[in-house]
From Swiss-Prot:
Name the record gives this protein: DNA-directed RNA polymerase subunit beta
Pfam families: RNA_pol_Rpb2_1, RNA_pol_Rpb2_2, RNA_pol_Rpb2_3, RNA_pol_Rpb2_45, RNA_pol_Rpb2_6, RNA_pol_Rpb2_7
Catalytic reaction list: RNA(n) + a ribonucleoside 5'-triphosphate = RNA(n+1) + diphosphate
Gene name tied to this protein: rpoB
Role according to the record: DNA-dependent RNA polymerase catalyzes the transcription of DNA into RNA using the four ribonucleoside triphosphates as substrates.
InterPro entries documented for this protein: DNA-dir_RNA_pol_bsu_ext_1_sf, DNA-dir_RNA_pol_bsu_external_1, DNA-dir_RNA_pol_su2, DNA-dir_RNAP_su2_dom, DNA-dir_RNAP_su2_hyb_sf, RNA_pol_bsu_bac, RNA_pol_bsu_CS, RNA_pol_bsu_protrusion
Species of origin: Rhizobium meliloti (strain 1021)
């Protein structure tokens, strides 16, 4: 037999149904976040050689800062990060931000200024490192830890800077005329709009202010009227020819027109075209070939044309007419009488070329540059008197000053592309030529040439990721700082100060803190399961600062656009008001350096598909014809069919195969990660697929994770990239394993500066952001050989390195006594008994002991008026034990607070001092379990302020922590010793020693026996003759000592951190956190779902024996309603059921063979069966080469059910499902006879039975159920608060009042509106009455009525309550004032 391979059982093997080979590697799924932030910080770049981007660019743009007089200057040299004070884990525990101190090197230059000449000479240069606040660091998983919680910065989609042409779709004007507009959007700075109005005059607006004629803007740029006309129009020359005029023949301008009079050749005088004929391109070409040069024209032909140049008498300087004036019966004689016999006119025919700019110029009141500048100044700063200097300065600052206006590289690139310019992308301000080009193109659009832009095209929208958002925020902080620095530089004696004294880093640090703490894009990470983490990091939001708002966003922005293909998922988006505004990045998509989303394609060369992959953005892709990934190819890579379905410029079309330039790399490149995890996605309706993607993110990690039988092949990718499953950083051998850590001795990538040991700490029962449980379990055993990238530990919701969000359940589709009406789900008791859908949730409770005005609060066991029974779970420090079972009302941490009281007499004080009576002056403020939560205490953390004495419990926790650290250090030390001494023996062996430990004979040749006579620590004393080898030994020794001291130093640092007190919020002396784990079994009211949007609520849990059962006696686990399928069109769930049934059947078959083999049969049938299932196909396992032990391992793994992968859009088809069912020896219909569990009779018809992957969603009835007795009231209205978190009541709304009114239930209604709600006096009386055993009550005036009276009074209405009940005397009495 060929060389045998072994299978270690640490990964799940799947039968792969995909037919299309994967050419491109899928990029790391959280690359978006990590790459962006790395580019911003550039920690690893050398200080001198950092490129101008990210943080470096921010500093470069703000510095140098000069003082107002120019006598000193502060320059930026470089920046560096120091090591963070606390690591990730410590920050999580202590509620700190994981950040590194930023040190910036600044140089202060002081000049001497010569008073007479004003020349500068350098007087002094000082350099200094200045601390500029802490910069948050990203964890390995792409998150930030801010105040102890994990947060994600979501990428934002916004409109790309550049120029956009658009029209109003005919909405602005009643005639429905299209009004075109252009808008230049910079990255930062003023917007410039250029737009037509209904009269076809072109206007400009700056920053959406009042409009000015565009010609004023052009004049402000330094052009005069003639120059403006010259730029936008060509001219024709009319020459006087006897009585008439001679005009050049221009075929292009005449195309398609009808002649109104005969066309006469000016040279020969013959008629070349009669009147009333249409001028076709062919006819014009013939005339040109005949040599027609000029035509005859009359005075009438001249009328209506416009002058191209001023008509000036050069001798006297008199201007008869100006450029742009119309020639008519009055003006023509003036020109002729002045003796002009050549008249240049503008080529405006009102058909192909309109007179818009000329009309604007004549309507413009401003005559010259000064008027235009003043006009712009008045628009921008109304009410200020303009001067030439201030107007010029302001106009230049608007668009031409790099500090105020920045197009950014993207903006410049987009502008070049749209306007056909060729300007380097370092020119980031506008130029005169840009503005002219924009106006030109706008006028052409109005003339019917060119297309408007589609703002929803992904070529016009770009992504701002973490790095860029942070960069903008930090720039704001630095600019705030700059003002303060300038003032300080001017106000103090500059010669004596250092850079440190000028800088106050608070504004910069505050900007960072504000961004991470309260920006709309900095979000609390969705951490229900690994998939929700990954999806959150890949999210693209159109909301946020500088983006859209929900209310303003229309339908177009939210809609799926053809350019989304392969870039943004068309399926995964929230339902509700954010639909389409929050999207997810597609699986293969990546963001390029300009912020545009790119998608990969395979190149096609000479009609053959190659494996070269290119990434293209939406703009670049429009040029090509792109074939789909599932196009049929021949063996040599050419297309089988003559015509191929392809995409081109946003349209799907059939094109000849020779025209195709690119091809998709994979069918799943158009969907997001969550959608790519849905098998048979292609058979589901899109709306249900959307729900399926969204609900997978809400699946709670279960106690026992189980990978799906029917997967898509994406599961291992998600588990690895999310960081839930731990992958080995480098190859090696497992040295130690326990539940909390794995120690691997590295055998590859051995770098002398790094330790040769990898220690992987596993998270045990940690609380996630959503209170689910994060727990990692090792998969390896001591001695295992590990390769780089192998999965060595499973995390939450992972199983053998596969994502496992739910469990495979045996499902029957049939109605069952109405218990699955309307999507309800019927479950078997087995599911509860075997903990199939049991999950662990961890709640965190924290209590603080503060320093109050009346004295400090105290955490203690000594609580007044509490029975010993209630204290049974507390230790002597008053803190609950780990492992205690707690229920609602139990004390977790005992705490007493001093309470104020009346001043004491001196005698009382004396007695109090003698007898130390305590109970009267403190009250019990202990932390108790909230209603409705039962659980087990799994962890307690105690934090003390610096200098506060630690209690017994805190000391114990500290000791435990230090022991753990010591163990880590000792293990690493042991492996280091073992490695180093093994290398030392190899170096010494075979050499002759010239010196050695005490009692060693010189000149002996060293062997293992000789060396082992001495203790290890003395081996270093051997000296050998070979000098080179001796040098190596000494180098080894130095390296060993350094590693050892580094280990010890790290240990000491950690211990010091543990022993040192903690940073606490002001006024807090001590803080205790208690973590309680709650085991939640599934129960009626919990929400469950499949992966196809098939969701429902558990309606009943039925005893196992009552559930329907199969012929072999197996009871089904779940009964679903078949009516949930047809109307919702998610047929994928049925295909999954059949395929899951086949997988389980196949598993049973393999299990039976495995048992036979164990009982002594031959292994060959087992090997053949496994090979026939898993070994076939393009990604098959090499079963034939596996040794027997591996086959047994594989059989054990597959006996519950064979795992298969059916990738989206390239998965199993009906024939494959049938084949699998046949292989497993099951009916091809996928239906079985079922028996009623209660009567034992068969059901009338065959029922579809199979395995579906079911998820338990994070909508548990325990978290929702809630009942209020007496609770908090709202301050103003005195009505009960609402919601479970506030322990609120239920709203009795308007409609409910109508219902009681309809029933005439007057007393019930009165009770609802008064004593049960906001009649303050009444509700206390009712309470007293109930205590007395009396059940009558009297309703008073509701507080909300008083609020109404107060509001009316505040409007100036005098409202009083009068009692109209007449007493005996006959006078009316005044009621007490309602509002008092």
């Amino acid at each position: 037999m060929a060389q045998t391979l072994s299978f270690n059982g640490r990964r799940r093997v799947r039968k792969f149904f995909g037919k299309i080979p994967e050419v491109a590697e899928m990029p790391n799924l959280i690359e978006v976040q990590k790459a962006s932030y790395d580019q911003f910080l550039m920690v690893d770049e050398p200080q001198g050689g950092r490129p101008d981007e990210g943080l470096q660019a921010v500093f470069k743009s703000v510095f140098p800062i000069k003082d107002f007089s120019g006598a000193s200057m502060l320059e930026f040299v470089s920046y560096e990060f120091e090591a963070p004070k606390f690591d990730v884990e410590e920050c999580r525990q202590r509620d700190l931000t994981y950040a590194a101190p930023l040190k910036v090197t600044l140089r202060l230059i002081v000049f001497d200024i010569d008073e007479d000449t004003g020349a500068k000479s350098i007087k002094d240069i000082k350099e200094q490192n200045v601390y500029m606040g802490d910069m948050p660091l990203m964890t390995d998983n792409g998150t930030f830890i801010v105040n102890g919680t994990e947060r994600v910065i979501v990428s934002q989609m916004h409109r790309s800077p550049g120029v956009f042409f658009d029209h109003d779709k005919g909405k602005s004007h009643s005639s429905g005329k299209l009004l075109f507009a252009a808008r230049v959007i910079p990255y930062r700075g003023s917007w410039l709009d250029i737009e037509f109005d209904a009269k076809d005059i072109v206007h400009a607006r700056i920053d959406r202010r009042r409009k000015i004629p565009v010609t004023s803007l052009l004049m402000a740029l330094g052009m005069d009227g003639e120059e403006i006309l010259d730029t936008f129009y060509t001219k024709s020359l009319y020459q006087r020819d006897g009585e008439g005029w001679r005009v050049p023949f221009q075929p292009d301008a005449l195309k398609g027109q009808k002649t109104l009079a005969d066309m006469i050749d000016a040279d020969t005088g013959e008629v070349v075209v009669e009147s009333g004929k249409k001028l076709t391109p062919r006819l014009l070409r013939q005339l040109q070939e005949k040599g027609l040069k000029a035509l005859k024209a009359t005075d009438d032909d001249l009328y209506g044309n416009y002058l191209a140049e001023d008509v000036v008498n050069f001798e006297t300087g008199e201007i008869y007419l100006e450029a742009g004036d119309e020639i008519d019966e009055k003006t023509l004689p003036v020109i002729l009488s002045a003796g002009f016999d050549e008249i240049p006119v503008l080529d405006i025919d009102h058909i192909n070329i309109g007179a818009y700019i000329r009309n604007t110029l004549s309507a413009d009141k401003n005559e010259n540059r000064q008027d235009a500048l003043f006009d712009i100044y008045r628009v921008m700063r109304p009410g200020e008197p303009p001067t030439m200097d201030s107007a010029e300065a302001m106009f230049n600052a608007l668009f031409f000053d790099a500090e105020r206006y920045d197009l950014s590289a993207v903006g410049r690139v987009k502008m070049n592309m749209r306007l056909d310019l060729d300007v380097p992308d370092t020119v980031r301000t506008l130029r005169k030529e840009d503005i002219l080009a924009v106006v030109k193109m706008l006028v052409e659009l109005r003339d019917g040439k060119g297309e408007i832009d589609d703002i929803d095209n992904l070529g016009n929208r770009r992504v701002r990721s973490v790095g860029e958002l942070m960069e903008n925020q930090y720039r704001l902080g630095l600019l705030r700082m700059e003002r303060a620095i300038k003032e300080r530089m001017s106000s103090i004696e500059i010669d004596t100060v250092m850079p440190q004294d000028l800088i106050n880093a608070k504004p910069a640090a505050a900007a960072v803190r504000e961004f991470f703490g309260s920006s709309q894009l900095s979000q609390f990470m969705d951490q229900v399961n690994p998939l929700s983490e990954i999806t959150h990091k890949r999210r693209l939001s159109a909301l946020g600062p500088g983006g859209l708002t929900r209310e303003r966003a229309g339908f177009e922005v939210r809609d799926v656009h053809p350019t989304h293909y392969g870039r943004i998922c068309p399926i995964e988006t929230p339902e509700g008001p954010n639909i389409g505004l929050i999207n997810s990045l597609a699986t293969f998509a990546r963001v390029n350096k300009y912020g545009f989303i790119e998608s990969p394609y395979r190149k096609i060369v000479d009609g053959k598909v190659t494996n070269d992959v290119v990434y293209l953005s939406a703009m670049e892709e429009a040029k090509y014809h792109v074939a789909q990934a599932n196009s049929v190819l021949d063996d040599d890579g050419s297309f089988s069919e003559e015509f191929v379905v392809c995409r081109h410029a946003g349209e799907v079309m059939l094109a000849p195969r020779d025209n195709i330039n690119l091809m998709d790399v994979s069918p799943k490149q158009l969907v997001s990660v969550a959608a790519a995890l849905i098998p048979f996605l292609e058979n589901d309706d899109a709306n249900r697929a959307l729900m399926g993607s969204n609900m997978q993110r809400q699946a709670v990690p279960l106690l026992r994770a189980e990978a799906p039988f029917v997967g898509t092949g994406m599961e291992p990718v998600v588990a690895r990239d999310s960081g839930a499953a731990i992958a080995a950083r480098r190859g090696g051998i497992v040295d130690q394993v326990d539940a909390t850590r794995i120690v691997i001795r590295a055998t590859e990538d051995l770098d002398p500066s790094k330790s040769g040991v990898d220690i992987y700490r596993l998270q045990k029962f940690q609380r996630s952001n959503q209170n689910t449980c994060v727990n990692q379990r090792p998969l390896v055993t001591v001695g295992d050989v590990i390769n780089k990238g192998d999965i060595i530990a499973d995390g939450p919701s992972t199983d053998l390195g596969d994502l496992a969000l739910g469990r495979n359940a045996l499902v029957a589709f049939m109605p069952w006594n109405g218990y699955n009406y309307e999507d309800s789900i019927l479950l078997s008791e087995r599911i509860v008994r075997d903990d199939v859908f049991t999950s662990i949730h961890i709640e965190e409770f924290e209590v603080m002991a503060r320093d109050t005005k009346l004295g400090p609060e105290e955490i203690t066991r000594d609580i007044p008026n509490v029975s010993e029974e209630a204290l049974k779970n507390l230790d002597e420090a008053g803190i609950v034990y780990i492992g205690a079972e707690v229920q609602p009302g139990d004390i977790l941490v005992g705490k007493i607070t001093p309470k104020g009281e009346s001043p004491m007499t001196p005698e009382e004080k004396l007695l109090r001092a003698i007898f130390g009576e305590k109970a009267s002056d403190v009250r019990d403020t202990s932390m108790r379990m909230p209603p409705g939560t039962f659980g087990t205490v799994v962890e307690v953390r105690v934090f003390n302020r610096h200098g506060v004495e630690k209690d017994e419990r805190a000391m114990a926790i500290e000791r435990e922590e230090i022991e753990r650290l010591a163990k880590d250090r000792d293990d690493e030390q042991a492996i280091l010793d073992r490695n180093v001494y093994a290398r030392l023996v190899d170096m010494l062996r075979g050499h002759v020693a010239v010196a050695g430990p005490k009692g060693f004979k010189k000149g002996t040749e060293l062997s293992n026996v000789v060396i082992s006579e001495y203790p290890r620590s003395q081996w270093w004393m051997f000296a050998i003759e070979d000098e080179k080898a001796q040098g190596e030994i000494e180098a080894l020794r130095a390296q060993y000592d350094e590693s050892k001291s580094r280990l010890e130093q790290r240990f000491m640092d950690k211990v010091e951190k543990v022993q040192r007190g903690d940073e606490m919020p002001p006024g807090v002396m001590k803080m205790v956190k208690v973590f309680v784990a709650v085991k939640r079994k599934i129960q009626p009211g919990d929400k469950m779902a499949g992966r196809h949007g098939n969701k429902g609520v558990v309606s009943r849990i039925v005893p196992i024996e009552d559930m329907p059962f199969l012929e072999d006696g197996t009871h089904v686990d779940v009964v679903l309603n078949p009516l949930g399928v047809p109307s919702r069109m998610n047929v994928g769930q049925i295909l999954e059921t059949h395929l899951g049934w086949a997988c389980a059947g196949m598993g049973k078959k393999i299990g039976a063979m495995l048992d036979a083999y164990k009982a002594g049969a031959d292994i060959q049938p087992l090997r053949d069966t496994i090979d026939s299932v898993i070994g076939s196909g393009p990604k098959g396992e090499p079963i034939k080469q596996y040794d027997d032990e591996s086959i047994v391992r594989l059989a054990e793994q597959t006996r519950r059910g064979v795992s298969i992968a059916t990738p989206v859009f390239d998965g199993a088809v009906e024939a494959d499902v049938n084949e699998m069912l046949e292989q497993a020896g099951l009916k091809v219909t996928g239906q079985s006879t079922l028996y009623d569990g209660r009567t034992g009779e068969t059901f009338d018809r065959q029922v579809t039975v199979g395995y579906i992957y079911m998820l338990k969603l994070n909508h548990l009835v325990d978290d929702k159920i809630h009942a209020r007795s007496i609770g908090p009231y709202s301050l103003v209205t005195q009505q009960p608060l609402g919601g479970k978190a506030q322990f609120g009541g239920q709203r009795f709304g308007e409609m409910e009042v109508w219902a009681l009114e309809a029933y005439g239930a007057a007393y019930t209604l009165q009770e609802m509106l008064t004593v049960k709600s906001d009649d303050v006096a009444g509700r206390t009386k009712v309470y007293e009455a109930i205590v007395r055993g009396d059940d009558t009550f009297e309703a008073g005036i509701p507080e909300s009525f008083n609020v109404l009276v107060k509001e009316m009074r505040s409007l100036g209405l005098s409202v009083e309550l009068e009692n109209s009940k007449v007493d005996d005397v006959g006078s009316t009495a005044q009621l007490p004032d309602a509002a008092e």
